[in-house]
């Protein structure tokens, strides 16, 4: 994955987070937390990939 693909994945997860956060059920809150964790992992991947691309 390159940084553009990772950024698009982060944007998709943010959209899910916003949608699920607006809901009131426990399941929706769980999905929101899951999306937040995915964003965290993607951000780490973005930093690694960005550094690699800068070196190339």
Predicted regions and their residues:
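Short intrinsically disordered terminal tails
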Residues: 1, 55-56
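N-terminal acidic leader/helix
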Residues: 1-22
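Short, charge-rich amphipathic interface segments used for partner binding and complex assembly
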Residues: 26-55
């Amino acid at each position: 994955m390159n940084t553009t693909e990772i950024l698009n994945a982060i944007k998709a997860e943010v959209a899910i987070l916003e949608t699920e956060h607006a809901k009131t059920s426990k399941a929706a809150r769980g999905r929101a937390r899951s999306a937040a964790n995915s964003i965290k992992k993607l951000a780490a991947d973005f930093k690694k990939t960005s550094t690699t691309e800068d070196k190339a």
